[in-house]
Amino acid sequence: LSGKSLQEEATMDFDLPSDLVAYLAELDAFIEAKIKPLQARDDNERFFDHRREHARTDWDNNGLPRKAWEALLAKARKLADDAGHLRYAWPPEMGGKGGTQLAMAVIREHLAAKGLGLFNDLQTEHSIVGNNPFILMFKEFATNAQYERDGEKLLGGKMRTGFGLTEPNHGSDATFMETTAVRQDKDGEPGWLIRGEKMWTTGMHVATHVMVFARTSGKDGDATGITCFIVPADSPGVKIEEYMWTFNMPTDHPRVSFTDVWIPKDSYWGQIDRGLGLGQSFVHQNRIRQAASSLGAAQFCVDESVKYARERKPFGKALSENQAIQWPLVELQTQCEMLRLLIRKTAWQMDRMEHKEIERTISDKVSMCNYWANRLVCEAADRAMQVHGGMGYSRHKPFEHIYRHHRRYRITEGSEEIQIRKVAAYLFGYAGPKRAQFKDQAGA
């Protein structure tokens, strides 16, 4: 074939869509015009410089976020919403722009690569381009009656939901949860009685409701028989037992008990006994976006280290001339480049598949992206601390904050071990596309 023919036949294109490139520039302009001035006012820099952990954390109130910190985040979200950015990923029929998986992955990387700032706070997962999986979860699984009942409140921010899936004794093995819900009438009204405990119940300090996953039928280990209930946070029997203090503070993750909590019969989302699928429905979306954020933060650490190594001149010679400095950063940059391509390819493929097809065919790729990105950013932050020396270890640089925050994602969003197990299942044909192939070979 001639060169021209090869060009005509080519189908591989690594260029980002032009409208996405333009949107990144639009976001950058918005940050410069609106977000940075807000961050610079009223000593708001205290939430991002060396004072950040204390400025954000109310140590005398269970380690919860200070009200001033949450108020600042709310102001930034309002500016973003007014400018049309906050709901970018929402479906158009829900007031959004229908942002694709590829676009969201690129945006998350782009913002995280800028470092710490009001435009995209790592710790709270606040961003001027909102993620909010509950919106898409609700759209996908809510019945017409549920949508009519809760849709306007949820979209308008009047309904804020905590998330209760993990339990003190059950994390990765969610199908063994001990929380139960049984049908029980109260004063002649049919309903449910919930008993159990949940752990790391995100957002309970501001929640109006909490999503409680409880077993309604079946036995331990069954994926079916679990229902997602929507419980008013002020229901009798709902009690925040303690807020769990973590490596990176403040916290909004309590242990919550549910003691004979009664709710009306229609207080659930999705279908009875099919709630676990709701809880896991957007796990791929969350994991690919989290991978992109970790990649962006890793790239920031590498870029800052390279810049510093060129500027710092001990003994009259730039650090960057030393192979002991060069080689670890070369390794990290190589991983960033490879991971970026896999994340974008996987996100692009996700845009062309229904959820069930993603699970059947490329769930392992999502796990590859997620576990490796979260490991990579920890390595990059640690290396940045080393390159920057004493200042790198101090809180006057952001690397310790990046490390402390992203270290959690090697446990949450599916632990590193669970992700690797998923990849292994696909690789060895215990799940995924190779399963039938290996089964046929075994039969032969």
Could you describe each region identified by the protein language model?
Residues 1-11:
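Short, Lys/Arg-enriched N-terminal segments with co-localized hydrophobic residues
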Residues 12-118, 141-146, 153-157, 186-187, ...:
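Alpha-helical interface subdomain recognition
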Residues 122-145, 171:
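N-terminal glycine-rich flavin-associated loop
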Residues 139, 190-240:
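A short core secondary-structure module
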Residues 157-165:
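A short, Trp-centered hydrophobic/proline-enriched beta-strand micro-motif
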Residues 181-183:
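A structural signal for short hydrophobic beta-strand segments in well-ordered beta-sheet cores
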Residues 234-262:
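Flexible, small-/acidic-enriched active-site or ligand-binding loops
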Residues 260-278:
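Long, acidic (Asp/Glu-rich), low-complexity accessory segments flanking structured domains
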